[in-house]
Amino acid sequence: MKQGIHPDYREVVFQDMSNGFKFITRSTIQTRETIEFEGKTYPLAKIEVSSESHSFYTGQQKIMDTAGRVEKFKNKFGARASGKAAK
């Protein structure tokens, strides 16, 4: 195998931003943030949803609008989305 062409495969902490859950796994993700976890320093990758917060795994329905998607939709399709018929 050629040297220097493969990504750095290392332990990374992923943090679920919706509930704060953290877990360690191995990944090639590139990130500048680090975190102290279980006595060691790891690269930190922030994610919006994980198995700890996704409704399929938790059995609970939860509405998340972290990116303002509802407001963006209402601004774009305001009259049509509110049920008013355009004539």
From Swiss-Prot:
Keyword S-adenosyl-L-methionine found = no
> Gene3D superfamilies from the entry?
Ribosomal protein L31
Keywords carried by this UniProt record: Ribonucleoprotein, Ribosomal protein
What's a GO cellular component annotated to this UniProt protein?
ribosome
Pfam families attached to this UniProt entry: Ribosomal_L31
Domain of life, source organism: Bacteria
TM helices/strands, residue ranges: none
Q: How does it assemble?
A: Part of the 50S ribosomal subunit.
Organism of derivation: Burkholderia mallei (strain ATCC 23344)
Molecular functions per Gene Ontology:
structural constituent of ribosome
GO BP terms in the entry: translation
SUPFAM superfamilies on file: L28p-like
- Report the family membership: Belongs to the bacterial ribosomal protein bL31 family. Type B subfamily.
Protein's recorded name:
Large ribosomal subunit protein bL31B
Q: Which HAMAP family match?
A: Ribosomal_bL31_2
